[in-house]
């Protein structure tokens, strides 16, 4: 059977000339893992299942590859290392597979205990919520769950030109305000973050500040990891926050993007990353303790994760496994350039949590430089996004 003949697989997201909103990962759960795949720690313990599972669905003109694992096993860059090694091995290039590091010692703890640079206090500590504020934050979050139960997870295809227009719009708005002089740097990630924050702010029933929660990857922040001479297939992400006032969040893209750039630049320095790690090492309970939340207790929490650096479309090459067939017009529609290359990918939790909302997963670019984003949002926010994308 061809993939377009399958009632579910034919609806997998495809690249479009204009921006589009398409079905989310939950519509394709059957292709991700077997029906009884472990979804909790208890499931892994009682089923004696392996930490990493592979689920293959084959069609005459396409193959769907599903990987499932607990997030404690690895992050997106660990997944990149795994898929890169897999591609090299299939091509008979085992000698090029990087050395696997960190199996017997924790390089992150070692870096925290032996800093190579100046020691600083954690700047986020000044914004950490006190007990009373944390209670207010929890009560507000609980109220939001009760009054806004409906959320929808969808996938967005954003053409290269659309994202570049967002970035240039942000830069132009800052230049018009004569901010930061002439040398204004706003990344595509900053622009997309600002775009998501603004959509949530404009769809909020009342003005509220927003705290964007980012995943900051240690592999790019600590010299001992950058120059390690191999790869770490594990989770090396810590939290970073962007704090946006209610007024700024509902305003122009430029100031939001600039604040995101400023906050992340401040928190991503080696001394600040080490300060964060030292606090975790000194009090491991902070990993699960809600007191690590920072910012305004009245803020809307908006988690972001950006996978663009993983460059899955560039490093995944399963062409040695292709038995026959050539690229078709359908391959081009899906963003593929050669048989055995990645045309689309997404991620989902095998266990849906009712508290998941206001989440953006920037999955990165396809072969045509289109950006793909999966988001879990309230219907009013989706209305704002569709209007902004020019869909309605």
Descriptions of predicted regions:
Residues 1-30, 109-138, 324-340:
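Charged, glycine/proline-rich intrinsically disordered loops and linkers
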Residues 1, 101-172, 202-206, 214-224:
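Short amphipathic alpha-helices and their capping loops
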Residues 1-24, 147-155, 221-225, 242-249:
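Acyl-group handling in specialized metabolite and lipid biosynthesis
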Residues 1-66:
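Acyl-thioester-dependent condensation/acyltransferase catalytic cores
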Residues 153-155, 159-392:
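Acyl-CoA-dependent O-acyltransferases
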Residues 44-117:
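Active-site-proximal acidic secondary-structure segment that organizes catalysis
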Residues 23-43, 141-148, 155, 323, ...:
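Long, low-complexity, polar/charged, intrinsically disordered or flexibly structured peripheral segments
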Residues 60-62, 150, 184:
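Short hydrophobic "helix-edge" motifs at membrane interfaces and signal-peptide entry regions
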């Amino acid at each position: 059977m061809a993939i377009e003949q399958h009632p579910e697989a034919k609806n997998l997201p495809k690249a479009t000339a204009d921006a589009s909103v398409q079905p989310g990962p939950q519509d394709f759960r059957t292709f991700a893992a077997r029906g009884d795949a472990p979804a909790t720690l208890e499931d892994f313990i009682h089923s004696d299942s392996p930490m990493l599972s592979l689920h293959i669905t084959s069609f005459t003109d396409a193959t769907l590859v599903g990987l499932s694992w607990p997030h404690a096993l690895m992050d997106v860059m660990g997944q990149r290392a795994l898929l890169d090694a897999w591609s090299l091995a299939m091509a008979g290039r085992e000698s090029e597979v990087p050395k696997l590091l960190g199996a017997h010692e924790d390089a992150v703890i070692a870096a925290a205990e032996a800093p190579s640079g100046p020691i600083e206090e954690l700047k986020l500590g000044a914004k950490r919520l006190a007990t009373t504020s944390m209670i207010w934050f929890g009560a507000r979050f609980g109220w939001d769950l009760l009054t806004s139960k409906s959320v929808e997870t969808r996938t967005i295809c954003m053409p290269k030109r659309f994202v570049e227009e967002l970035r240039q719009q942000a830069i132009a708005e800052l230049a018009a305000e004569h901010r930061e002089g002439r040398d204004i740097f706003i990344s595509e990630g900053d622009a997309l973050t600002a775009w998501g924050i603004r959509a949530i702010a404009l769809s909020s029933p009342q003005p509220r500040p927003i705290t964007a929660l980012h995943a900051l990857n240690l592999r790019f922040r600590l010299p001992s990891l950058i120059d390690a001479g191999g790869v770490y297939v594990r989770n090396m992400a810590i939290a970073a926050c962007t704090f946006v006032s209610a007024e700024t969040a509902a305003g122009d893209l430029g100031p939001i993007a600039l604040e995101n750039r400023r906050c992340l630049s401040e928190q991503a320095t080696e001394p600040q990353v080490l300060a964060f790690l030292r606090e975790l090492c000194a009090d491991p309970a902070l990993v699960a303790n809600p007191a690590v939340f920072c910012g305004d207790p009245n803020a809307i929490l908006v988690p972001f994760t950006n996978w663009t650096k993983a460059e899955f479309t560039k490093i995944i090459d399963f062409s040695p496994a292709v038995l026959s067939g050539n690229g078709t017009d359908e391959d081009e529609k899906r963003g593929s350039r050669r048989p055995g290359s990645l045309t689309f990918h997404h991620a989902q939790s095998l266990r849906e949590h009712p508290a998941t909302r206001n989440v953006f997963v920037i999955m990165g670019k396809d072969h045509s430089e289109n950006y793909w984003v999966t988001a879990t949002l309230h219907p009013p926010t989706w209305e704002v996004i569709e209007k902004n994308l020019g869909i309605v």
